[in-house]
Amino acid sequence: MTDLEVSAIQVIDENKVFNSLLVDYMKQFYSQNNSSDDKGLNYHIVSVFGSQSTGKSTLLNHLFHTKFDVMDESQRQQTTKGIWLAHANHISSSNESGDFANNTKNVFVMDVEGTDGRERGEDQDFERKAALFALSTSEILIINIWEHQVGLYQGANLGLLRTVFEVNLSLFAKNKQRCLLLFVIRDHVGNTSLESLSDVLTLDLQNIWSQLNKPQGTEGFELDDFFDLKFVALAHKLLQPDKFIEDISVLGDKFISEDQLFNEGYHRAIPIDGWSMYAEQVWEQIETNQDLDLPTQQILVARFRCDEISSQVYESFHEQFVKSNWDDLSFTEIGNSLKELRQNAVQQYDILAGRYSESVYLQRKKLLVQKVDLSILEVYTSVLQKLIRQSRDLYLKQIESSLTKKEAGIIFYQVLDNAERESLKYFNENTSLISFVDVDDSEARSYDPSPKLRELEEELSNLRTELVNKEQENIKTKIPRKFKSHFKLIVQDELSNIKPSSWEELLDQFRQVSEKLLAKYKSPDSNYDFHLGLSKEKNKELHEQVLIKFWIKFKEILNDFVTETNVLRLLVSKFEDEFRYDEEGLPVVWKNSAEIDVKFAKARNSALDLLPLFSLAHTAEGEILPDYDIAHDEAEAESDNEEDDGFKESHKFAHLLSARDQDAIRNKFKKQTDALYVETKRSVINSKTEVPLYIYALLLVLGWNEFMIILRNPLLITLLLIGLTGLYLGYKTKLLGPIVQVVQAMIQELQDQAKNKLRDVLVSEPEAPSQVRIGKEVDATKDED
């Protein structure tokens, strides 16, 4: 039997000190035999007590193959001191395979110091405390008595049992915690049947129960409400050794059986890893003579163990959590990793802590989940923020891509709608990948992506508003700019040849260009929709703002074109056209000065008649007025470029030239036209100067020979006839003046070139000697040096 015996550990020594190594002892044997047990409840505690030297330790050693110290029969003295505990690896059995069976139920047995020992004498304090400890921690309480002690009060430990009953009633009255009292009657020789002995003991126990001082509220409780009684008889160990072993085996079969002795109602429901702490706290309460509240002790153990388990689980979770490089993982990998980490932590806690008090277990579980979620939420929130950024970037990228394609019929607000739909779809699809908790999980409300979705929707809404406003400004800038580029040419062409009907024609052209540029925004109901998703009122407001910009651009074009310089140039051009050319567009050949005076006066008056047309833009109905008040908008535009000089009245649309401007133009026009008049007058006077008659006679006398040579020479006469014919044609076509001017210009050019050539020759000739002389002087200077 020695190879099957297991060493014991002292739980409480004779000095009433609890052994802190008990927890390691119990875990050691429990883990060896219950590696697959998750709850830690597959164990049983069996205690034995009785009078000293009655063979309690011997009984346990034979029954459970333990190694408790036994009494030396040569010396009658105390052997078991304090309370000892041992794991029963094997239990005696009568089965055919051997004389023992494996301890699959993890039975731990406690050997309690015997009562009525001479070592303690009258001091019964430890006896009562030990009995109370055994009752508080054990499922089965073995009471070891001799057959001849049945019927005795002290010998059968009935006095101690009375104390046990009273304490049990005070401890377990609320929850009616049950316990099995197993009376093992030793040295039964068979003269008195076991049934008779059982009846005697049962009657004694009931008498003791009836005489108890029951606490208030427990008067109606009976012995059967708290204790189950069973009786076993064992033969004499020395006189009937074989029978004794047989009876031990039969008793062992009862412990092995599923329904003979053990009952779920006896179990204290303390997991094995918390039993040592529970036992220590119970003993501390007993030792300090405090009221022992076992349910409270169980709660305290549950709290301690659940906190300990929670810390261990969180440390394991955190170790795995910090190892993960979340930035390098995809959304699917992040979701799976977070889900696995969270589920593993919760499941591990459920396995280890679910064995304790449900209220404590759930409370600590909630705290653990909150702590785990704090870490996970950092990653979860970070991922959601990353998703928001990516969704926003996708939104802008979709818009840019659609607008860049410039497809026909593209509508701006539809582009925004499509981009928003794709952005939200991207966000929702990826949030579903990282959603790793059920929506019914009350602890998972922090993982609801709805707040972040609303944040994204709000951000997209703000972006949409910003883009729509930007597009409105773009429309108010781009379309008026295009209007200006088109209408500017029309204004230049029309005002360059201004006439009384020009302003009416320009106004018609203004409306035509405006309608043409806005035609694509016009809806069938004659309203305007700029495809920005705006309301009817907003579209109307934008349309008016664009038209205001058109009028402002109209005003800018007029201001740029109708300036003193341009108007003066146009008036002078008009004057020259009428003064230099006739109605057929041919250059005028002046015959006399009177003709110049008439033509000059007519041309100048005709040109000056155009000045009022430039000064005021008006039609037959009156001056042109914008359809909208552009004073405020125009003033804002001008304030960025120039300061108000006190004379500018920007709100007067039709007033282009002030009286001062007109006077300045008239004065400059008068000076330029007067200069032209004088030049023309001088050229006519020069061409009309008369040659004296004697000059002709003198030419005839002196040039008679030359004249005759020409007449006699056919070539010369031919050239003369051609020259005369050309002069005649020039005279008839009134081109003699231009011909003379061209000839004079040619002669002048020939003279200039001749002078330049002569100057070059005269200047270049003396240069060579001077250079030689200078060179010699330089050489002479060098020689002197």
UniProtKB/Swiss-Prot annotation:
Intervals, Lumenal compartment: 712-714
**Which parts of the chain are coiled coil?**
451-479
Q: Hey, which stretches end up on the Cytoplasmic side?
A: 1-690, 736-785
Major location (coarse): endoplasmic reticulum
**Entry-linked InterPro entries:** G_GB1_RHD3_dom, P-loop_NTPase, RHD3/Sey1, Sey1/RHD3-like_3HB
The GB1/RHD3-type G domain extends over: 40-266
Output one GO BP term: endoplasmic reticulum membrane fusion
Leader peptide range in chain numbering: none
Q: Which CDD domains match?
A: GBP
Q: Does the keyword Repressor apply?
A: no
Cite the GO molecular-function annotations of the record.
GTP binding; GTPase activity
Print the keywords alphabetically.
Coiled coil, Endoplasmic reticulum, GTP-binding, Hydrolase, Membrane, Nucleotide-binding, Transmembrane, Transmembrane helix
Q: What class of enzyme is it?
A: hydrolase
- Compartment(s) of residence: Endoplasmic reticulum membrane
Where, in this chain's numbering, is GTP bound?
50-57
Record-linked HAMAP family: Sey1
Q: Which family does it belong to?
A: Belongs to the TRAFAC class dynamin-like GTPase superfamily. GB1/RHD3 GTPase family. RHD3 subfamily.
Can you say what this protein is called? Answer: Protein SEY1
Q: Which organism is it from?
A: Komagataella phaffii (strain GS115 / ATCC 20864) (Yeast)
Q: Gene symbol?
A: SEY1
